[in-house]
């Protein structure tokens, strides 16, 4: 006997509901992710490439590097890694207008002309982090002495010790994206901009740089600022992992770091690597040859040309303090960044260096919240972190990172220079961030 129509309809409806439920689970799992890369930094190993050991899903992967002979970037196993950012034109209200051709920023994805050099454009050229519904979650597990660490990078929150601090906005919300500048900051109509074909801003104090960045905000919104510490640490960790080395200049390129002058910097124009893809560098370093600029994750001059002022970390009377988010969800007790350290968290470390409070970085100090420069004695241009640390021993120092056009081998991703907020010079500038 045939089933009653109403029973057959009920059965069909139940089966369809089950199919829909399974599809929904698959979609959730796809968004949730399943990748956990890892690496360990061995503080006792002076060779910067031997100091990094792959863990978890990174085991067996081939490191990336710039081939200085062919002029091509060798991706190794990392070209399709989930954390790769995407170049875009970002409206001043924080929404994406359109994406750029990653191999030619003068074009949109569809091949038509972009606004990357248009100073009348109401927005900026930025890298969008967080793709395909997957954010970047990082967990830092310090060694017992806090001088080494295991670092894990995942496309989902594996446990509560994985954090996505760079994705937190001024309202304390965890969002899908955060944005970093493609170019060094330029000053156009009193706004700090990220556009191609521009001269870099110079001789501004930290407060002035922040005010120029915030001039991009629409109405009462608080999305735009200068570089942020938690962004920089995540990006530096990704660079260490991809290159399987702490020596970023050797892996990715020297940058514009040798024999620079104010005149050379003044003549530099952003956008020299618009057609060089996501990564590019040379092993020359001459600041007067602008095509020596380094490019990582689609961004020009992550080091070189100018020191880049960074918010979220300070040295206060010799001790490092920090803040990973605009709000207080990171455990800090003050909203917004400041130049006093009030409401910031203690990193638990006071840097040591030569009699001049400087030197090549030998040791970083790791906590679950970040990585902080510790020892600037015993390092060199080819050992440990291969980059420089300078700090003031009293008062408040605001970090400037990366190195400038006259830094030479001391420049790189691990370079930190803590200087008074009032400091201003031709070799120091800032770049935009947006959350």
Predicted regions and their residues:
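GGW-centered surface loops in extracellular recognition modules
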Residues: 28-128, 135-136, 224
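C-terminal, surface-exposed recognition/capping segments
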Residues: 37, 42-43, 233, 254, ...
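Carbohydrate-recognition beta-sandwich/jelly-roll modules
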Residues: 57, 64-66, 81, 105, ...
């Amino acid at each position: 006997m045939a089933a009653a129509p109403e029973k057959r309809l009920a059965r069909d409806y139940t089966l369809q509901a089950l199919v829909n439920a399974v599809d929904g689970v698959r979609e959730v799992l796809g968004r949730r992710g399943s990748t956990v890369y890892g690496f360990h930094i061995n503080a006792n190993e002076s060779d910067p490439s031997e100091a990094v050991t792959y863990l978890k899903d990174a085991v067996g992967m081939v490191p990336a590097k710039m081939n200085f002979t062919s002029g091509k970037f060798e991706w190794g196993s990392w070209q399709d890694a989930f954390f790769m950012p995407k170049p875009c034109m970002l409206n001043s209200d924080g929404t994406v207008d359109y994406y750029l051709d990653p191999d030619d920023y003068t074009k949109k994805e569809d091949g038509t002309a972009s606004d990357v050099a248009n100073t009348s454009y109401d927005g900026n050229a930025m890298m969008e982090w967080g793709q395909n519904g997957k954010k970047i979650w990082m967990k830092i597990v310090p060694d017992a002495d806090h001088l080494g660490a295991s670092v894990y990078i995942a496309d989902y929150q594996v446990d509560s010790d994985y954090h996505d601090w760079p994705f937190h906005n001024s309202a304390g919300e965890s969002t899908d994206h955060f944005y970093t500048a493609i170019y060094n900051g330029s000053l156009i109509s009193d706004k700090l901009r990220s556009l191609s074909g521009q001269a870099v801003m110079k001789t501004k104090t930290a407060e002035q740089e922040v005010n120029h960045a915030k001039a991009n905000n629409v109405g009462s919104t608080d999305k735009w600022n200068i570089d942020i510490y938690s962004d920089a640490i995540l990006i530096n960790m990704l660079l260490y992992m991809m290159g399987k080395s702490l020596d970023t200049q050797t892996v990715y390129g020297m940058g514009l770091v040798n024999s620079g002058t104010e005149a050379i910097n003044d003549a530099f124009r952003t956008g020299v690597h618009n057609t060089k893809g996501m990564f590019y560098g040379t092993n020359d370093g001459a600041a007067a040859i602008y095509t020596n600029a380094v490019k990582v994750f689609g961004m020009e001059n992550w080091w070189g040309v100018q020191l880049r002022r960074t918010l979220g970390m300070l040295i206060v009377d010799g001790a490092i303090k920090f803040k990973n988010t605009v709000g207080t969800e990171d455990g800090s007790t003050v909203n917004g960044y400041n130049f006093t350290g009030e409401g910031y968290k203690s990193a638990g470390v006071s840097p040591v260096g030569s009699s001049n409070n400087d030197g090549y970085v030998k040791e970083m100090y790791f906590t679950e919240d970040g990585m902080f420069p510790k020892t600037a004695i015993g390092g060199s241009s080819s050992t440990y972190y291969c980059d420089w640390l300078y700090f003031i021993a009293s008062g408040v120092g605001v970090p400037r990172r990366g190195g400038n056009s006259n830094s030479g081998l001391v420049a790189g991703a691990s370079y930190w220079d803590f200087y008074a907020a009032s400091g201003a010079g031709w070799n120091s500038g800032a770049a935009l961030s947006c959350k």
